[in-house]
Amino acid sequence: MTDPVRLTRYARGGGCACKIPPGELEKMVAGLGPATGTSDLLVGLDHGDDAAVVRLDERTGLVTTADFFTPVVDDAYDWGRIAATNALSDVYAMGGTPLVALNLLCWPRDVLPLELAREVLRGGQDVARDAGCHLAGGHSVDDEGPKYGLAVTGVVRPEELITLDAGRAGLPLSLTKPLGVGVLNTRHKATGESFPEAVAAMTTLNRDAARAAVAAGVRCGTDVTGFGLLGHASKLARASRLTVAIDAARVPYLAGAREAVRDGYVSGGSRRNLEWVAGWTDFGGIAEDDRLLLADAQTSGGLLVAGELPGATVVGELLPPGEHRVVVR
Protein backbone atom coordinates (compact mmCIF):
# COMPACT_ATOMS: atom_id res chain seq x y z
CA MET A 1 0.00 0.00 0.00
CA THR A 2 1.38 3.40 -1.00
CA ASP A 3 1.78 5.97 1.77
CA PRO A 4 -0.34 9.11 1.28
CA VAL A 5 1.48 12.05 -0.28
CA ARG A 6 2.38 14.79 2.20
CA LEU A 7 2.11 17.95 0.11
CA THR A 8 3.75 20.12 2.76
CA ARG A 9 6.99 18.20 2.19
CA TYR A 10 7.17 19.88 -1.22
CA ALA A 11 6.85 23.43 0.15
CA ARG A 12 9.78 25.64 1.12
CA GLY A 13 7.41 27.86 3.05
CA GLY A 14 3.81 27.35 3.98
CA GLY A 15 0.85 29.38 2.70
CA CYS A 16 1.12 33.12 3.25
CA ALA A 17 4.32 32.55 5.25
CA CYS A 18 6.06 31.97 1.90
CA LYS A 19 5.61 35.62 0.92
CA ILE A 20 8.64 37.79 0.22
CA PRO A 21 9.39 39.49 3.59
CA PRO A 22 7.45 42.77 3.94
CA GLY A 23 10.50 45.01 4.25
CA GLU A 24 12.09 43.54 1.12
CA LEU A 25 8.79 43.72 -0.76
CA GLU A 26 8.36 47.42 0.01
CA LYS A 27 11.86 48.18 -1.26
CA MET A 28 11.19 46.17 -4.41
CA VAL A 29 8.03 48.09 -5.37
CA ALA A 30 9.10 51.52 -4.12
CA GLY A 31 8.56 54.13 -6.81
CA LEU A 32 6.56 51.83 -9.07
CA GLY A 33 3.38 53.70 -9.87
CA PRO A 34 0.55 52.92 -12.27
CA ALA A 35 1.49 52.38 -15.91
CA THR A 36 -0.78 55.27 -16.87
CA GLY A 37 -1.80 58.06 -14.52
CA THR A 38 -5.56 58.25 -14.13
CA SER A 39 -8.02 59.50 -11.54
CA ASP A 40 -10.07 56.35 -12.17
CA LEU A 41 -7.49 54.25 -10.29
CA LEU A 42 -9.06 54.47 -6.84
CA VAL A 43 -6.64 52.10 -5.10
CA GLY A 44 -3.17 51.21 -6.34
CA LEU A 45 0.25 50.56 -4.83
CA ASP A 46 0.32 53.58 -2.52
CA HIS A 47 -0.43 51.82 0.77
CA GLY A 48 -0.33 48.13 -0.10
CA ASP A 49 -4.07 47.56 0.13
CA ASP A 50 -5.54 44.11 -0.43
CA ALA A 51 -6.57 44.70 -4.06
CA ALA A 52 -6.50 47.29 -6.82
CA VAL A 53 -9.68 49.21 -7.60
CA VAL A 54 -10.56 51.04 -10.83
CA ARG A 55 -13.66 53.20 -11.22
CA LEU A 56 -15.95 51.99 -14.01
CA ASP A 57 -18.65 54.58 -13.43
CA GLU A 58 -20.06 56.64 -10.56
CA ARG A 59 -21.66 53.60 -8.95
CA THR A 60 -19.18 50.81 -9.69
CA GLY A 61 -15.54 50.07 -9.00
CA LEU A 62 -13.71 47.05 -10.44
CA VAL A 63 -11.72 45.15 -7.79
CA THR A 64 -8.87 42.93 -8.97
CA THR A 65 -6.33 40.80 -7.11
CA ALA A 66 -4.22 37.64 -7.32
CA ASP A 67 -3.03 35.36 -4.53
CA PHE A 68 -1.36 31.95 -4.62
CA PHE A 69 0.99 30.01 -2.37
CA THR A 70 2.60 26.71 -1.43
CA PRO A 71 0.74 23.95 0.47
CA VAL A 72 -0.18 24.60 4.11
CA VAL A 73 -1.83 21.20 4.63
CA ASP A 74 -1.18 17.74 3.22
CA ASP A 75 -4.71 17.14 1.93
CA ALA A 76 -4.94 18.37 -1.68
CA TYR A 77 -8.65 19.17 -1.58
CA ASP A 78 -8.34 21.15 1.65
CA TRP A 79 -5.35 23.06 0.28
CA GLY A 80 -7.41 24.05 -2.75
CA ARG A 81 -10.24 25.24 -0.52
CA ILE A 82 -7.88 27.23 1.71
CA ALA A 83 -6.06 28.89 -1.20
CA ALA A 84 -9.32 29.89 -2.90
CA THR A 85 -10.82 31.23 0.33
CA ASN A 86 -7.68 33.25 0.91
CA ALA A 87 -7.68 34.76 -2.60
CA LEU A 88 -11.36 35.71 -2.45
CA SER A 89 -10.73 37.42 0.88
CA ASP A 90 -8.82 40.25 -0.80
CA VAL A 91 -11.99 41.34 -2.58
CA TYR A 92 -14.09 41.02 0.57
CA ALA A 93 -11.51 43.03 2.53
CA MET A 94 -12.09 45.96 0.16
CA GLY A 95 -15.85 45.82 0.76
CA GLY A 96 -16.43 44.18 -2.62
CA THR A 97 -18.15 41.15 -4.11
CA PRO A 98 -16.15 38.63 -6.20
CA LEU A 99 -17.61 37.90 -9.64
CA VAL A 100 -15.13 35.80 -11.60
CA ALA A 101 -11.84 34.03 -10.86
CA LEU A 102 -9.09 32.19 -12.72
CA ASN A 103 -7.01 29.31 -11.38
CA LEU A 104 -3.26 29.85 -10.94
CA LEU A 105 -1.54 26.46 -10.69
CA CYS A 106 2.13 25.47 -10.56
CA TRP A 107 2.67 21.71 -10.50
CA PRO A 108 5.72 19.38 -10.58
CA ARG A 109 4.13 17.00 -13.08
CA ASP A 110 7.04 14.52 -13.01
CA VAL A 111 6.95 14.30 -9.22
CA LEU A 112 3.34 14.54 -8.06
CA PRO A 113 0.37 12.79 -9.70
CA LEU A 114 -2.02 14.92 -11.73
CA GLU A 115 -4.89 13.37 -9.78
CA LEU A 116 -3.73 15.40 -6.78
CA ALA A 117 -3.70 18.57 -8.87
CA ARG A 118 -7.27 17.82 -9.86
CA GLU A 119 -8.22 17.56 -6.18
CA VAL A 120 -6.64 20.96 -5.55
CA LEU A 121 -8.66 22.46 -8.40
CA ARG A 122 -11.81 20.76 -7.14
CA GLY A 123 -11.33 22.37 -3.74
CA GLY A 124 -10.98 25.78 -5.33
CA GLN A 125 -14.03 25.18 -7.49
CA ASP A 126 -16.20 24.24 -4.51
CA VAL A 127 -15.22 27.37 -2.58
CA ALA A 128 -15.82 29.62 -5.60
CA ARG A 129 -19.24 28.02 -6.04
CA ASP A 130 -20.08 28.67 -2.37
CA ALA A 131 -19.03 32.29 -2.85
CA GLY A 132 -21.21 32.70 -5.94
CA CYS A 133 -18.08 33.48 -7.97
CA HIS A 134 -17.56 32.08 -11.47
CA LEU A 135 -14.35 30.04 -11.80
CA ALA A 136 -13.63 30.15 -15.52
CA GLY A 137 -10.35 28.48 -16.44
CA GLY A 138 -6.91 29.76 -15.53
CA HIS A 139 -3.23 29.11 -16.17
CA SER A 140 -0.84 26.28 -15.27
CA VAL A 141 2.95 25.97 -15.16
CA ASP A 142 5.16 22.89 -14.84
CA ASP A 143 7.20 23.96 -11.80
CA GLU A 144 9.59 22.51 -9.23
CA GLY A 145 7.10 22.91 -6.39
CA PRO A 146 3.29 22.99 -6.10
CA LYS A 147 1.59 26.37 -5.80
CA TYR A 148 -2.07 27.28 -6.15
CA GLY A 149 -4.38 30.25 -5.89
CA LEU A 150 -6.72 32.49 -7.83
CA ALA A 151 -6.80 35.72 -9.76
CA VAL A 152 -10.09 37.31 -8.73
CA THR A 153 -12.17 40.15 -10.15
CA GLY A 154 -15.09 41.71 -8.33
CA VAL A 155 -17.08 44.90 -7.92
CA VAL A 156 -17.55 47.45 -5.17
CA ARG A 157 -19.54 50.63 -4.72
CA PRO A 158 -16.94 53.42 -4.46
CA GLU A 159 -18.72 54.91 -1.45
CA GLU A 160 -18.49 51.53 0.34
CA LEU A 161 -14.79 50.97 -0.34
CA ILE A 162 -12.75 49.76 2.67
CA THR A 163 -9.11 50.89 2.61
CA LEU A 164 -6.08 51.17 4.86
CA ASP A 165 -5.96 54.97 4.87
CA ALA A 166 -9.51 55.76 6.04
CA GLY A 167 -9.01 55.29 9.79
CA ARG A 168 -10.12 57.84 12.40
CA ALA A 169 -8.87 58.16 15.97
CA GLY A 170 -11.32 56.80 18.52
CA LEU A 171 -12.64 53.92 16.42
CA PRO A 172 -12.43 50.40 17.90
CA LEU A 173 -10.53 47.68 16.04
CA SER A 174 -12.31 44.37 15.54
CA LEU A 175 -10.89 41.01 14.45
CA THR A 176 -13.23 38.47 12.84
CA LYS A 177 -11.14 35.25 13.13
CA PRO A 178 -8.80 33.93 15.82
CA LEU A 179 -5.06 33.91 15.21
CA GLY A 180 -2.76 30.90 15.28
CA VAL A 181 -3.10 29.10 11.96
CA GLY A 182 0.52 29.86 11.11
CA VAL A 183 2.05 28.08 14.09
CA LEU A 184 -0.45 25.22 13.79
CA ASN A 185 0.36 24.79 10.10
CA THR A 186 4.06 24.77 10.96
CA ARG A 187 3.44 22.03 13.52
CA HIS A 188 1.36 20.09 10.99
CA LYS A 189 4.18 20.27 8.44
CA ALA A 190 6.75 19.05 10.98
CA THR A 191 4.75 16.31 12.70
CA GLY A 192 1.77 15.41 10.52
CA GLU A 193 -0.64 16.28 13.35
CA SER A 194 -4.04 17.49 12.12
CA PHE A 195 -5.80 20.62 13.34
CA PRO A 196 -9.41 20.59 12.06
CA GLU A 197 -10.23 23.88 13.79
CA ALA A 198 -7.46 25.62 11.87
CA VAL A 199 -8.68 24.15 8.56
CA ALA A 200 -12.22 25.27 9.39
CA ALA A 201 -11.00 28.82 10.07
CA MET A 202 -8.97 28.95 6.86
CA THR A 203 -11.91 27.74 4.75
CA THR A 204 -14.44 30.16 6.22
CA LEU A 205 -15.18 32.90 3.70
CA ASN A 206 -14.87 36.50 4.88
CA ARG A 207 -18.05 37.24 2.91
CA ASP A 208 -20.40 37.60 5.89
CA ALA A 209 -17.88 39.67 7.85
CA ALA A 210 -17.41 41.98 4.86
CA ARG A 211 -21.15 42.40 4.41
CA ALA A 212 -21.50 43.23 8.10
CA ALA A 213 -18.67 45.75 7.82
CA VAL A 214 -20.24 47.49 4.84
CA ALA A 215 -23.64 47.55 6.57
CA ALA A 216 -22.01 49.09 9.66
CA GLY A 217 -20.43 51.85 7.60
CA VAL A 218 -16.86 50.61 8.06
CA ARG A 219 -14.42 52.39 5.74
CA CYS A 220 -11.05 51.31 7.11
CA GLY A 221 -9.75 47.77 7.30
CA THR A 222 -7.74 44.92 5.83
CA ASP A 223 -7.44 41.17 6.12
CA VAL A 224 -4.84 39.56 8.38
CA THR A 225 -2.65 37.25 6.33
CA GLY A 226 1.07 36.76 5.77
CA PHE A 227 2.36 39.79 7.68
CA GLY A 228 0.57 38.82 10.89
CA LEU A 229 -1.68 40.99 13.04
CA LEU A 230 1.19 43.32 13.94
CA GLY A 231 2.31 43.73 10.34
CA HIS A 232 -1.13 44.49 8.95
CA ALA A 233 -1.96 46.76 11.91
CA SER A 234 1.28 48.64 11.22
CA LYS A 235 0.36 49.15 7.56
CA LEU A 236 -3.06 50.46 8.59
CA ALA A 237 -1.51 52.83 11.13
CA ARG A 238 0.97 54.17 8.60
CA ALA A 239 -1.61 54.67 5.85
CA SER A 240 -4.10 56.38 8.20
CA ARG A 241 -1.36 58.36 10.00
CA LEU A 242 -2.49 57.08 13.37
CA THR A 243 -1.34 54.76 16.13
CA VAL A 244 -2.94 51.34 16.52
CA ALA A 245 -3.38 50.09 20.08
CA ILE A 246 -3.74 46.33 20.52
CA ASP A 247 -5.01 44.85 23.78
CA ALA A 248 -3.00 41.63 23.96
CA ALA A 249 -5.34 39.92 26.43
CA ARG A 250 -8.31 40.38 24.09
CA VAL A 251 -6.77 38.78 21.00
CA PRO A 252 -8.41 35.36 20.33
CA TYR A 253 -6.33 32.30 19.44
CA LEU A 254 -7.11 28.86 18.07
CA ALA A 255 -6.78 25.93 20.44
CA GLY A 256 -3.21 24.65 20.47
CA ALA A 257 -1.62 27.85 19.15
CA ARG A 258 0.11 28.79 22.40
CA GLU A 259 1.41 25.26 22.82
CA ALA A 260 2.76 25.28 19.26
CA VAL A 261 4.74 28.46 19.93
CA ARG A 262 5.97 27.09 23.25
CA ASP A 263 7.23 23.99 21.45
CA GLY A 264 9.07 26.05 18.84
CA TYR A 265 6.81 25.63 15.79
CA VAL A 266 7.29 29.15 14.45
CA SER A 267 7.85 29.78 10.73
CA GLY A 268 10.68 31.90 9.40
CA GLY A 269 8.05 34.21 7.91
CA SER A 270 6.58 34.93 11.33
CA ARG A 271 10.00 35.68 12.79
CA ARG A 272 10.73 38.04 9.89
CA ASN A 273 7.40 39.77 10.54
CA LEU A 274 8.42 40.39 14.14
CA GLU A 275 11.80 41.77 13.07
CA TRP A 276 10.08 44.08 10.56
CA VAL A 277 7.66 45.67 13.03
CA ALA A 278 10.03 45.85 16.01
CA GLY A 279 11.37 49.31 15.16
CA TRP A 280 7.98 51.04 15.40
CA THR A 281 6.14 48.87 17.93
CA ASP A 282 5.88 49.36 21.69
CA PHE A 283 5.43 45.81 23.00
CA GLY A 284 4.54 46.89 26.51
CA GLY A 285 6.63 44.18 28.13
CA ILE A 286 4.72 41.19 26.72
CA ALA A 287 6.56 37.87 26.53
CA GLU A 288 8.41 36.72 23.41
CA ASP A 289 5.86 33.96 22.76
CA ASP A 290 3.06 36.55 22.75
CA ARG A 291 5.02 38.73 20.34
CA LEU A 292 5.48 35.78 18.00
CA LEU A 293 1.76 34.99 18.10
CA LEU A 294 0.86 38.58 17.27
CA ALA A 295 3.32 38.41 14.34
CA ASP A 296 2.23 34.90 13.29
CA ALA A 297 1.89 34.69 9.51
CA GLN A 298 -1.76 33.88 8.91
CA THR A 299 -3.17 32.08 5.90
CA SER A 300 -6.76 33.01 5.01
CA GLY A 301 -7.12 35.02 8.21
CA GLY A 302 -9.98 37.23 9.27
CA LEU A 303 -10.72 40.89 8.72
CA LEU A 304 -9.27 43.65 10.91
CA VAL A 305 -11.68 46.58 10.70
CA ALA A 306 -12.12 49.98 12.32
CA GLY A 307 -15.54 49.47 13.86
CA GLU A 308 -17.59 46.94 15.79
CA LEU A 309 -19.14 43.93 14.05
CA PRO A 310 -21.51 41.24 15.33
CA GLY A 311 -19.52 38.16 16.33
CA ALA A 312 -16.14 39.88 16.00
CA THR A 313 -13.74 40.54 18.86
CA VAL A 314 -12.70 44.10 19.71
CA VAL A 315 -8.91 43.80 20.05
CA GLY A 316 -7.90 47.45 20.26
CA GLU A 317 -8.53 50.93 18.96
CA LEU A 318 -7.19 53.70 16.76
CA LEU A 319 -5.39 56.51 18.61
CA PRO A 320 -4.02 59.90 17.54
CA PRO A 321 -0.52 59.54 16.07
CA GLY A 322 2.18 58.96 18.66
CA GLU A 323 5.78 57.83 18.94
CA HIS A 324 4.97 54.30 17.73
CA ARG A 325 2.76 53.00 14.93
CA VAL A 326 1.61 50.10 17.10
CA VAL A 327 1.27 49.97 20.88
CA VAL A 328 0.58 46.64 22.60
CA ARG A 329 -1.18 47.09 25.92
Label each region the model flagged:
Residues L41-V43, A51-V54, S89-Y92, Q125, ...:
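A generic local secondary-structure boundary/capping motif
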Residues A151-L161, E193-V214, I286:
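Active-site glycine-rich loop that binds ribose-phosphate moieties when present
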Residues E58-V73, D78-R81, T97-A190, S194, ...:
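Glycine-rich anion-binding loops of enzyme active sites
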Residues T2-A93, C133, R168-S174, T313-V314, ...:
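N-terminal glycine-rich phosphate/pyrophosphate-binding loops that anchor nucleotide-derived ligands
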Residues A76-L102, E119-D130, L205-R219, L229-K235:
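Small-aliphatic-rich amphipathic alpha-helix that forms the alpha element of a beta-alpha
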Residues A52-V63, T203-A209, L274-G284:
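Acidic-glycine-rich active-site phosphate/pyrophosphate-binding loop
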Residues M1-G13, E24-M28, S39, R109-H134, ...:
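Glycine-/charge-enriched secondary-structure boundary and capping motifs
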Residues I20, G154, A306-E308:
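Short beta-strand-to-loop capping motifs
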